[in-house]
Swiss-Prot record:
The gene is ccdc25. The keyword Coiled coil applies. The chain crosses the membrane at residues 35-51. It holds the Pfam family NFACT-R_1. It comes from Dictyostelium discoideum. It comes from the Eukaryota. Residues 1-34 are extracellular. This is Coiled-coil domain-containing protein 25 homolog. InterPro entries: Jlp2/Ccd25, NFACT_RNA-bd. Belongs to the CCDC25 family.
Length: 206
């Protein structure tokens, strides 16, 4: 079971698992467009923000970042009781699992690809609005990821085919122009030869 929430202005979707075991599937089948959020040094929900195509985690609007942090803090048993917490976030692709790690536990491939939001305090107004958008879904995470990858491969093939057609057209246009230049050059050469060996006799016109 996955919980989905709608963030606004601009609109984004974020989601989280209901327990640490489901978090394992979220880690396994996350998307390259996803950004992972967690309360630093405390147990909490794993919240994922899904970016739009072409965006990077550096493009997250400040208000959307705040809403993600509020959602993470609210869904931490200990964190929600603290006056303030630090939130850690990183691209999904930077999450690392190793043998023997507990369910829901993660490391990072690159510590430099990790950011923090310090001293996050509860904002009840934001929490109340987000909670109203809560939607619980039964999701086949593996199927969704496979569909996403299939669509991406289709788009890449389409782009490559369009590129090949454009390159072919450009090549044909270039060849056409070169053929025209060659033809023009040949005609000029032939005219020069004709004029050289066939001089006009003015008496012919008298």
């Amino acid at each position: 079971m996955v919980l989905y929430f709608k963030l606004i202005d601009p609109e984004y979707i974020c989601y989280m698992g209901i327990d640490k075991f489901e978090n394992e599937d979220l880690i396994k089948y996350g998307w390259p467009e996803d950004v992972w959020f967690h309360v630093n040094d405390l147990s909490s929900a794993h919240v994922y923000l899904r970016l739009r195509k072409g965006e990077t985690w550096n493009d997250i609007p400040a208000n959307i970042l705040e809403e993600c942090c509020q959602l993470v803090k609210q869904n931490s048993i200990q964190g929600c009781k603290e006056a303030s917490v630090d939130i850690v976030y990183t691209p999904w692709a930077n999450l690392k699992k190793t043998a023997g790690m507990e369910a829901g536990q993660v490391l990072y491939h690159n510590e430099r690809e990790v950011k923090y939001v310090r001293n996050v305090r509860k904002d009840s107004k934001i929490i109340n609005r987000i909670e109203k958008t809560r939607e619980k879904r039964e999701v086949d995470l593996m199927h969704e990821r496979d569909s996403r990858d299939k669509s991406e491969r289709h788009e890449k093939r389409k782009e490559q085919e369009e590129k090949r057609r454009a390159e072919k057209k450009a090549y044909e246009e270039k060849q056409k122009m070169e053929d025209i230049k060659k033809y023009t050059s040949i005609m000029k050469t032939d005219n020069m030869k004709f004029n050289k060996y066939n001089p006009t006799d003015e008496d012919d016109f008298m």
